[in-house]
Amino acid sequence: MRTYVDANVFLYAVLYDDARSQRCRKALEAIVAGRLEAVTSLLTWDEFSHVVERILGREVAVQEGERFLRFPRLDFLPCSMDVLVRAQRLRANTALGARDCLHAATALLAGATTFLSEDTDFARVPGLTRQPV
């Protein structure tokens, strides 16, 4: 079963050093080791890179963005018109923000019904099972 990995899992792993960030790093290690079949949107790079730059600066964001794009055993899913249409439907029928609708729509269309995220809003998306880290 494929698991969609939300941007916040990558962000916590890079930005912080606490119990939650350690759990995020362990989840990412499980992907690298092949114990977790994982996908995320290509758009996750945008969110990840933007937040890392805002907190740690442009140079670190460029380095971490390059590492992110080479992440082993992580499948990057495209943003298609089908994703946008599904995201728009989610936007109309849930309280999710636009970017979160894109993530949820990408997961649903890819059949990745387990959604690894620290964001509790995803627990209310029909068809997804939010899995906290």
Question: At which residue positions do the language-model features occur?
Answer:
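Short, well-structured N-terminal submotif of metal-dependent ribonuclease cores
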Residues: M1-T40, E53-Q63
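Active-site-proximal, substrate-binding regions of enzyme catalytic domains
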Residues: E47-S49, E53-D75
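Acidic, PIN/NYN-like endoribonuclease modules and their adjacent C-terminal/linker elements
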Residues: R2, A104-V133
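A general alpha-helix detector
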Residues: V9-F10, E47-V51, R86
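Histidine- and aromatic-rich ligand-binding microenvironments
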Residues: V5-D6, T40-S41, L96-G97, D119, ...
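Structured helix-beta-strand junction loops
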Residues: A33-R35, F71-P72, V125
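Alpha-helix capping/helix-boundary segments
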Residues: V9, T44, V83, H103, ...
